[in-house]
Amino acid sequence: MFKVGIGYDVHRFVEGRKLILGGVEIPFEKGLLGHSDADVLVHAIIDAILGAMGENDIGRLFPDSSPNYKDISSLVLLKEVAKLLEEKNMKIVNIDSTVVSQRPKISPYTNEMKNKIADCLKIESTQVNIKGKTTEGLGFEGREEGISAYAVVLICE
């Protein structure tokens, strides 16, 4: 049986933090605010996987009220979700995702992001797709207040 899940996340920019997207540190003057490393792309992918599995969302599985997850790499959380998939004998068919930001442009980093995400999930990088989009200056992303990400995941049992 095939199952699909959709994920979404958003974080706002702040001074004094690193910008991490898809597990990759991207040179930029601001980072994203969050309890963990605030990796919106990985968070959206985690939520999509959990949704396809019929599980709770990322906030319930890894609550921001827990000190265990303070500043944690989202790739560590993704590996935990990969273990859940394995326990349920489910496999990822593919992931399609979109990062929405006016700046920075992510295209120079997408191959590295794909590889890191695929490694965590024990799948091929060809099963992971990452696109970058702007909002042509519209909305909070267009005003460079933050970044959002969307992900769709297809899994099979």
From Swiss-Prot:
Its EC number is 4.6.1.12. It catalyses: 4-CDP-2-C-methyl-D-erythritol 2-phosphate = 2-C-methyl-D-erythritol 2,4-cyclic diphosphate + CMP. Binds 1 divalent metal cation per subunit. A divalent metal cation binds at D9, H11, H43. The keyword Metal-binding applies. One of its GO terms (molecular function) is 2-C-methyl-D-erythritol 2,4-cyclodiphosphate synthase activity. The keyword Aminoacyl-tRNA synthetase does not apply. Pathway: Isoprenoid biosynthesis; isopentenyl diphosphate biosynthesis via DXP pathway; isopentenyl diphosphate from 1-deoxy-D-xylulose 5-phosphate: step 4/6. One of its GO terms (biological process) is isopentenyl diphosphate biosynthetic process, methylerythritol 4-phosphate pathway. Keywords: Isoprene biosynthesis, Lyase, Metal-binding. The record marks H35, T134 as: Transition state stabilizer. 4-CDP-2-C-methyl-D-erythritol 2-phosphate binds at D9, V10, H11, H35, S36, D57, I58, G59, F140, R143. Its cofactor is a divalent metal cation. Pfam families: YgbB (PF02542). Homotrimer. Belongs to the IspF family. Involved in the biosynthesis of isopentenyl diphosphate (IPP) and dimethylallyl diphosphate (DMAPP), two major building blocks of isoprenoid compounds. Catalyzes the conversion of 4-diphosphocytidyl-2-C-methyl-D-erythritol 2-phosphate (CDP-ME2P) to 2-C-methyl-D-erythritol 2,4-cyclodiphosphate (ME-CPP) with a corresponding release of cytidine 5-monophosphate (CMP). This is 2-C-methyl-D-erythritol 2,4-cyclodiphosphate synthase. It comes from Caldicellulosiruptor bescii (strain ATCC BAA-1888 / DSM 6725 / KCTC 15123 / Z-1320). The lineage of its organism: Bacteria, Bacillati, Bacillota, Bacillota incertae sedis, Caldicellulosiruptorales.
